[in-house]
Regions:
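Phosphate- and other anionic-substrate recognition elements at nucleic-acid/protein interfaces
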Residues: 1-153
Length: 153
């Protein structure tokens, strides 16, 4: 059986995070601010990633299960999912399951499983600070991890 090439993309306010995995091995990760500017930029970003990595599967957040994202963010997710569909790729939309008390605990657990991302682990913020830029990277990794751990269910 061939090893699955998986591209997971997450969108947060003003940022798009993506991770690329071959099997269970994390090989690439990126945070883009430009991709979050508009659905056109998001689609172009997704197309660039697809052209560069040739994934078998693209994982995005399931829009119907999202309660905490605005209309602009949902439009970005939809634009990237359309690109996957246009490229005849399997676009798996998974719910963003929060298995930890907060994003920082989740990032800590994911950094233990994928130590190559440990330097990008976001630190807990104070209430008056903006959300750390790299949280979206760990959201993308959580989507990929959810997909990998729930195959065949």
């Amino acid at each position: 059986m061939a090893t699955t090439r998986l591209l997971a993309i997450a969108v947060a306010s003003g940022r798009v995070g993506s991770v690329f995995m071959i099997g269970d091995t994390l090989t690439y990760w990126q945070v883009s601010v430009k991709a979050a500017e508009s659905p056109v930029e998001a689609a172009a970003h997704a197309q660039t990633l697809i052209n560069g990595f040739w994934p078998d599967v693209i994982v995005t957040e399931e829009p119907n299960a999202v309660r905490h994202k605005g209309a602009e963010t949902l439009a970005l997710i939809a634009a990237m999912a359309r690109v996957a569909e246009d490229c005849d790729l399997l676009d798996v939309q998974v719910p963003r399951v929060q298995r930890f008390p907060n994003k920082y605990a989740e990032a800590e657990a994911l950094a233990l499983r994928y130590p190559e991302l440990a330097p990008w682990k976001p630190h807990k913020r104070r209430f008056y600070q903006a959300e750390p830029r790299n949280t979206v990277l760990f959201e993308a990794l959580a989507l990929a991890d959810f997909m990998l751990n729930n195959r065949g269910e």
